[in-house]
């Protein structure tokens, strides 16, 4: 029978997703067939499978670490917040409906059968399934309808490792407090504790670990150091938005929209020597830069209103006057147009809003969501400044509710040739006459090595800088990072004990 291991945390952002990825890689290295699983995920960063189905980005990342293709079975429920009180519910990769938190709480018991079926499918195909919890198991107000923490552990009879984040302080109290709030049968299921994100001399920490073990009557199975690994993160509560690369000939500013989604689009840019990538957060100014990128968003109209409220639109217009490059991805592409219409008020209470007017397109928000993996070719009649991009083949994915229509003589940016493996011929995106402004629906476009190299060299040439000859292969880079992650965690955790724990719970 299949072995199981569940990773729960004392809070959100303690490092559960990365540790699950680490376990997936370790088990793969040890010769096991392994898959990740998270019954319910809340995130704006998502991934499109080969079948055109949408799951949480973290489970796709964990599947990569496990060396397998991402599947909707790994994340049967995905919640994508569209406002403080509403979320889009995605079941098995397809949009179900928009729902309030209160409605969803009542709806959860109906999802148990679906969750169990998807877990059982993965268990039938693999030697080990590594399960990720969400937030904290000690949310006692949600206990009676829990489908993602202890409810999930009990449903699958999985042992639990509890993770605490020492970097933020208060790790001993958070671990002891979490255990205190659990029922006795839930406490008994926790087979060990992991201290994550440790910096400093572990000898100083050891007396505290011994005292903690005496208090909670659980073994600390490992202390994982704060890791400098570059792997896709999932949600927006991340340090990346406040990091600053201090050196670089080319400066790229990404607008951190209130409902920014798929910000992993820009991670490949941060890996290129000579690139200074930064995010423009609320209250900050774009300042002097070479490229402005407006990213994807779960609420295009609401985020465009925020962009105008913070007067970021005025700065974008100023960048346009200065001849800087302005790029829009997905929702950011929609914002660059003349108008965005939402007649059904699907995304907001506003039925129509004026766009930034930098591209001659209009967008209509529709009920039907486009979710596809794509192959495309950059068009061969781009303006001369972008001529190095002509005819470059790219791969990526689409996730959007709206459809954009080109007005006037504005030219498309690319031609989509395949959607979910089927041949098509569909124009994508739009580009200004001078080539300094363009938008596309293609997420992941900067992961294409040739495209990103040529685009960066275009920007470098515009500044009188010499071209870069080669850049990192992002897929190979990620593989090395997964191995690095596994190596660090393997050295930090008592893996022999982890295997023994899993064996004790073998059905």
Swiss-Prot record:
PROSITE patterns: GATASE_COBBQ (PS51274)
GO molecular-function term, one example from the UniProt record: ABC-type vitamin B12 transporter activity
Domain GATase cobBQ-type: 249-451
Family matches, as SUPFAM superfamilies: Class I glutamine amidotransferase-like, P-loop containing nucleoside triphosphate hydrolases
Any GO BP: cobalamin biosynthetic process
Keyword Plastid: no
Pathway named in the protein's UniProt entry: Cofactor biosynthesis; adenosylcobalamin biosynthesis
Protein origin, superkingdom: Bacteria
Parts forming coiled coils: none
Active site per database record: 330 (nucleophile), 443
Record keywords: Cobalamin biosynthesis, Glutamine amidotransferase
NCBIfam families: cobQ, PRK00784.1
Functional summary from the UniProt entry: Catalyzes amidations at positions B, D, E, and G on adenosylcobyrinic A,C-diamide. NH(2) groups are provided by glutamine, and one molecule of ATP is hydrogenolyzed for each amidation.
Family: Belongs to the CobB/CobQ family. CobQ subfamily.
Record-given protein name: Cobyric acid synthase
Organism: Thermoanaerobacter pseudethanolicus (strain ATCC 33223 / 39E)
Biological classification of the source: Bacteria, Bacillati, Bacillota, Clostridia, Thermoanaerobacterales
Gene: cobQ
């Amino acid at each position: 029978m299949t072995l199981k291991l569940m990773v729960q945390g004392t809070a959100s952002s303690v490092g559960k997703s990365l540790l699950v990825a680490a376990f997936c890689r370790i088990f793969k290295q040890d010769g096991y067939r392994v898959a990740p699983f998270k019954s319910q995920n809340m995130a704006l960063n998502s991934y499109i499978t080969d079948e055109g189905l949408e799951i949480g980005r973290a489970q796709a990342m964990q599947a990569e670490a496990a060396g397998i293709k991402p599947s909707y079975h790994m994340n049967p429920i995905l919640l994508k917040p569209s406002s403080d009180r509403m979320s889009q519910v995605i079941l098995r990769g397809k949009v179900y409906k928009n729902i309030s938190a209160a409605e969803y709480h009542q709806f959860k018991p109906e999802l148990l059968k679906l969750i169990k079926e998807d877990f059982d499918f993965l268990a039938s195909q693999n030697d080990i399934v590594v399960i990720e919890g969400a937030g904290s198991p000690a949310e006692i107000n949600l206990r009676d309808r829990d489908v993602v923490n202890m409810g999930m552990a009990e449903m699958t009879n999985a042992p639990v490792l509890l993770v605490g984040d020492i970097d933020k302080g208060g790790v001993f109290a958070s671990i002891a407090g979490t255990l205190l709030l659990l029922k006795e049968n839930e406490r008994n299921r926790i087979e060990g504790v992991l201290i994550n994100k440790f910096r400093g001399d572990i000898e100083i920490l050891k007396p505290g670990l011994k005292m903690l073990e005496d208090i909670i009557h659980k073994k600390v199975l490992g202390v994982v150091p704060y890791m400098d690994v570059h792997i896709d993160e999932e949600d927006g509560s991340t340090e990346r938005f406040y990091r600053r690369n201090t050196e670089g000939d080319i400066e790229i500013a990404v607008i951190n929209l209130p409902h920014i989604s798929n910000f992993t689009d820009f991670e490949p840019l941060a890996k290129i020597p000579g690139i200074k990538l930064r995010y423009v957060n609320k209250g900050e100014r774009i300042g002097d830069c070479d490229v402005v990128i407006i990213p994807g968003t779960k609420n295009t109209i609401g985020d465009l209103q925020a962009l105008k409220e913070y007067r970021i639109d005025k700065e974008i217009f100023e960048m346009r006057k200065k001849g800087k490059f302005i790029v829009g991805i997905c929702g950011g592409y929609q914002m660059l147009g003349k108008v965005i219409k939402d007649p059904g008020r699907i995304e907001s209470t506003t039925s129509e809003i004026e766009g930034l007017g930098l591209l001659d397109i209009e967008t209509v928000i529709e009920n039907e969501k486009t979710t596809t993996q794509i192959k495309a070719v950059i068009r061969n009649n781009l303006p001369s400044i972008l001529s190095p991009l002509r005819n470059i083949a790219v791969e990526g994915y689409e996730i959007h509710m709206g459809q954009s229509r080109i007005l006037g003589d504005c030219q498309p940016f690319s031609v989509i040739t395949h959607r979910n493996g089927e041949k098509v011929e569909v124009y994508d995106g739009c580009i200004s006459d001078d080539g300094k402004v363009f938008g596309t629906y293609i997420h992941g476009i900067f992961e294409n090595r040739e495209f990103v190299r040529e685009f960066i060299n275009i920007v470098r040439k515009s500044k009188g800088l010499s071209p870069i000859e080669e850049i990192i292969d992002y897929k190979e880079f990620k593989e090395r990072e997964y191995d690095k992650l596994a190596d660090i965690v393997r050295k930090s955790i008592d893996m022999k004990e982890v295997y023994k724990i899993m064996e004790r719970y073998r059905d």
